[in-house]
Amino acid sequence: MYKNKNGTWCSDFIMDGVRFQRRYPNSTETEALKLEKEWKEAIRKGVWETNVSSARGVMKLSEALSFLHDRYWKYLDDTTNYRVCLNRVIKAIGDKEVSTLTTADLYELKDKMLNKGVNGKIYSPHSFNSSLVALGTALRILEGLEVVKFKSKPNFKGLQVRQVVGKRPALRDDELLRAKEFLYNRAKKSKALSSVELYELFIVLSNLGLRPAEYFAIELGDISFEYDTITISKAVKTHKGTGTIIGAPKNGQSRTLPCGENVMEVFRNIRHRLEIARSVSKVEALKLLREIKGNDVLRMTYYWVSQGAYDNCKDLPLDKCPITHLNHDTANRMWWAVRNHLGYLGTSNTHGLYVLRHTVASRLVKLKGFNAYKLMAFMGYSDIKSSLHYIHLNVDDIRDGVGISV
């Protein structure tokens, strides 16, 4: 097991005179080692080669999809992309035999997805290009394994469609302040912990530009209250099925960010709630709730503890407690009210939670001396990862300039 120059963990070993290689995108070292161990066991048991030999012969697209998922794609971090794309292809041109596919089938796929529609749906150029790439990758792997032999090999050249990338939306300063006021007032009036946590999420995301999935994976131990920094080393992977699964960030690397006073105040409030929640039982919290007068913040904390909101932290060390109960679905559903308040009505999700990340990025590039390389380091973008080793962020400039100081 080794890490390549892009920061991706890779396998490269020899068994019975055969060399095996594989990459594990967006996986931590522990996850990659586990996947490599499972792979080696499959090879030793003979399952690996049996899969290839049994697949030779007539194979339809749906069978190819299952074969490639079991052999390759289930080891990738994003397990849905290839399946979704190939299922689109099957819906558009039918479950054809792989070896009989021709260039004409590719043009039929293009015409149906972009012009005629598939079951009444017209797909975007991005969706078509993704499906085309997935199909090309599948055919290349199958041909390389000699699972199929094409009667007339399809030519993918020149089929991709030009994509016009629109400008990423960002909120104006006045919109950020209106959103902050809206969330603050709702949190103050409501007894719901989720309303308070959405306000806290807004403060952090509008200052640090985290991906929502990164915020949902933060534990108290990721925050340095001594140095006013936060380390982002995890993200929630929502595409792997039911339940919360924590993996590496999108670029596979951790980063440490400086936090302004407004963000640290949020983190200190969260720590205070967690300390209280772990120090009293639900019965004790209910008793204290009835006894304490005047301190609304403390009363609400006891109320939430008495209702069992922090039961998930009782058996955890303090630094392992998650800082929020929100997840992707609840946060986005609650954010919809903010969109409507700002006047962004309709079903378009251009001003979803991710707009806060785009807003921070647009503000950072305006800082003096904050170039594109520093932006990519701060935001955790996946490209130019090899350049991140040479980036030296001006911590004081970032802390003073990032966010809106709400």
Where are these regions (language model features)?
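Basic, Lys/Arg- and aromatic-enriched nucleic-acid-binding interface segment
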Residues: V148-K151, N155-P212, F216-I218, E226, ...
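A short, basic/aromatic helix-end/turn motif that makes direct DNA contacts
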Residues: P25, A217-I223, M376-S382, Y390-L393
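Conserved tyrosine-mediated DNA breakage-rejoining catalytic core shared by Y-recombinases
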Residues: I218-I276, V280-G294, L298-M300
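Short amphipathic helical patch at the helix-1/turn junction of helix-turn-helix
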Residues: V133, V204-N207, V365-K366, I391
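Short, basic (Lys/Arg/His-rich) helix/loop patches that form interaction surfaces
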Residues: N185-S195, L257, E275-A377, Y381
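N-terminal DNA-binding module of tyrosine recombinases/phage integrases
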Residues: N4-C10, M15-Y107, E275-L316
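N-terminal core-binding DNA-recognition domain of tyrosine site-specific recombinases/integrases
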Residues: Y2, Y24, T28, H69-V147, ...
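Catalytic-site neighborhood detector that most strongly recognizes the C-terminal catalytic loop/helix
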Residues: A170, V236, A372, M379-I404
